[in-house]
């Protein structure tokens, strides 16, 4: 309860700050020659847009398939491509909305209700509703979510380049339950187990860091 109350209080403070800034900007409209870089929202938009367009606009699925070099795709590789498709779609939502918002801030287009929602959410440090709709469920604020976004992209890049990670960050997947189901399916193929009689279980290991693990297990994952 205290955690939610603190989040709500901080959100109200940010909202009040945003309104005060807007009021100040309105009063000082005569000083239109002020630098755009002085706008906190503009800085936020440009920073996130840089994340969304660097190093590339989206993952090239055809190239990823060639790099994997699998004649028959394993269940977990199928999941990887599904994850990449979802990530590309999410990235497109971020990129397109931020570019439109940047144009609106610069006065090139009008501010729609959707763009106004994105601007208000980012000003409060929240995740815009249209981003949430394309992303896995989350309670993260905008800053933490962007860090999560970058980290999951790093995992995908490593997965494409070097194969399935020795340690899989399930929290970085759009549908971790699908990956777990693929692990069960792969184990059943390898051991000739009946799929309908198999299940996943967890076990606590002595490892504390991903760097401590030398290789993936024969079945399952760390």
Where in the sequence are the language-model features?
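Long C-terminal appendages of very large multidomain proteins
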Residues: 1-222
């Amino acid at each position: 309860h205290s955690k939610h109350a603190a989040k709500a209080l901080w959100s109200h403070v940010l909202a009040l700050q945003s309104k005060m800034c807007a009021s100040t900007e309105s009063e000082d409209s005569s000083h239109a020659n002020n630098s755009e870089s002085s706008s906190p929202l503009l800085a936020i938009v440009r920073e996130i847009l840089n994340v969304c367009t660097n190093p590339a606009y989206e993952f090239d699925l055809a190239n990823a398939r060639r790099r994997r070099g699998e004649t028959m795709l394993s269940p977990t590789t199928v999941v990887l491509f599904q994850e990449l498709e979802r990530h590309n779609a999410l990235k497109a939502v971020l990129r397109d909305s931020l570019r439109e918002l940047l144009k609106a801030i610069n006065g090139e287009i009008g501010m729609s209700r959707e763009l106004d929602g994105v601007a208000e959410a980012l000003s409060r440090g929240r995740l815009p509703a249209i981003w949430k709709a394309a992303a896995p469920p989350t309670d993260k604020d905008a800053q933490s979510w962007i860090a999560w976004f970058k980290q999951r992209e790093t995992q995908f890049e490593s997965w494409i380049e070097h194969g399935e990670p020795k340690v899989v960050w399930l929290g970085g997947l759009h549908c971790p339950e699908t990956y777990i189901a693929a692990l069960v399916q792969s184990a059943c193929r390898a051991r000739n187990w009946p799929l309908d009689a198999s299940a996943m279980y967890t076990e606590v290991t002595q490892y504390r860091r991903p760097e401590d693990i030398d290789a993936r297990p024969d079945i399952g994952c760390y």
